[in-house]
Regions:
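Short, compositionally biased
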Residues: 59-70
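Basic, gly/Ser/Thr/Pro-rich low-complexity segments located predominantly at protein N termini
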Residues: 9-10, 32, 55, 63, ...
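Glycine-/charge-enriched secondary-structure boundary and capping motifs
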Residues: 14-19, 69-82, 86-198
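Glycine-rich anion-binding loops of enzyme active sites
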Residues: 1-59, 184, 196
Length: 198
């Protein structure tokens, strides 16, 4: 058993006495090609890449919202929420093709942007401004979530983040579809997120 980030608790989904088996894969990399988040410095640029939906996190809350508000989304919108988690291998492959070595990557899972970025930034932080998430079904769900809690539960339309040197930002924006600058690294702990225009 390899227990780690992909060991999920799913209250209300997996009944008692049932064991769910899941598959996973492990990648490998030459040591010389590994990236080191300890190299991040103020001024480094956060590039956010679009998510396809809520991906694999926040579903206990989503199910509760749907149970309490069964007509909040129609069947087609519900199916759109079930898009598989995007894996962002295209972004990583393009970064290598463009000779961009990011300082760090973050897959935005449970805990949203704040938790997934704060865990490796140490004494640094950022004030992030993300685009409005143009996903009708997701927005209907989010109307039932506390405005601040949404940032700490969901990916809010940004499923992957690369932190790059300022001189690499233009190339990094071309890596995979959906890249956008969402902020820069600063001194001082804490990730604060707002939606552009709110």
């Amino acid at each position: 058993i390899l227990a780690g980030g992909e060991t999920a608790e799913m209250p209300g989904v997996v009944p008692e006495s049932i064991v769910e088996l899941s598959g996973f894969c492990i990648g490998c990399c030459e040591k010389s090609k590994l990236i080191d988040p300890k190299t991040v410095r103020p001024g480094d640029v956060f590039i956010g890449y679009k998510s396809d939906s809520f991906h694999a996190n926040g579903w206990s809350l989503i199910r509760r919202i749907l149970e309490e508000n069964p007509d909040v989304v129609d069947e087609e919108e519900l199916r759109s929420l079930l898009q598989p988690t995007r894996l962002y291998h295209d972004v990583v492959a393009d970064m290598r093709r463009f000779n961009v070595t990011p300082k760090a990557y973050a897959h935005i899972t449970g805990g949203g942007l704040p938790e997934n970025l704060e865990r490796f930034l140490g004494d640094y932080g950022a004030d992030l401004s993300i685009p409005y998430w143009d996903n009708t079904a997701a927005q209907k769900i989010l109307k039932h979530v506390d405005p601040q809690d949404r940032f700490n539960t969901f990916n809010m339309g940004i499923g992957w983040v690369a932190i790059v040197r300022p001189e690499d930002a233009e190339a990094a924006l071309k890596a995979g579809p959906g890249g956008t600058v969402i902020g820069t690294l600063r001194e001082g702990r804490g990730i604060h997120v707002k939606v552009q225009g709110e």
